[in-house]
C-alpha cells in the first residue's frame, strides 16, 4: 500500500500528495488492515476510518505506535461498530479507549445491529463529509 499503491496513484493521477489530503478506511478485515497500515506508517494518512474492527491488546508496542501516529498529525480517526457485533465490538471499544487516552480527534459511532453492510453504509455516509476539511 505505502510503497506501491500510493506512489503509483501519485504518479498517474492528479492528486495532492500529502497526508492532509489522503484518507484510508476499511471494514471488517479491511478495518484491521487499516489499523495496521496506519499504526505502522505514521504520517502517511491524515484521515482514518475503521468499520467493525478494533484492536486485541493494548501493550507497550501498540501504545508507542499510536503515540507516533498521534504526533504525525492525524486529523480524524473514525471508528464505527454495531452494538450486536460479536466479532468486533470489544476491539472497537478498546481502540476508542486508546484514541481517547492518546488525545486523538476521533468519532465513535456505535449503531444498532451487527457486522453488516447496513451498518458499513451508515459509517461511510457519516465519515465521508468529514474528510479534507
Which residues does each predicted region cover?
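Non-catalytic cap/lid and distal C-terminal segments of serine-dependent acyl enzymes
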Residues: 1-133
Amino acid at each position: 500500500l505505502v510503497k506501491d499503491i500510493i506512489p503509483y496513484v501519485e504518479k498517474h493521477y492528479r492528486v495532492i500528495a500529502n497526508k492532509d489530503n489522503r484518507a484510508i478506511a476499511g471494514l471488517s478485515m479491511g478495518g484491521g488492515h487499516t489499523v495496521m497500515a496506519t499504526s505502522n506508517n505514521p504520517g502517511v494518512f491524515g484521515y482514518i476510518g475503521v468499520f467493525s474492527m478494533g484492536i486485541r491488546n493494548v501493550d507497550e508496542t501498540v501504545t508507542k505506535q499510536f503515540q507516533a501516529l498521534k504526533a504525525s498529525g492525524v486529523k480524524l480517526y473514525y471508528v464505527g461498530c454495531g452494538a450486536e457485533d460479536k466479532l468486533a465490538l470489544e476491539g472497537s471499544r478498546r481502540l476508542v479507549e486508546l484514541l481517547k487516552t492518546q488525545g486523538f480527534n476521533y468519532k465513535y459511532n456505535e449503531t444498532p445491529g451487527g457486522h453488516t453492510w447496513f451498518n458499513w453504509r451508515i459509517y461511510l455516509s457519516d465519515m465521508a463529509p468529514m474528510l479534507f476539511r
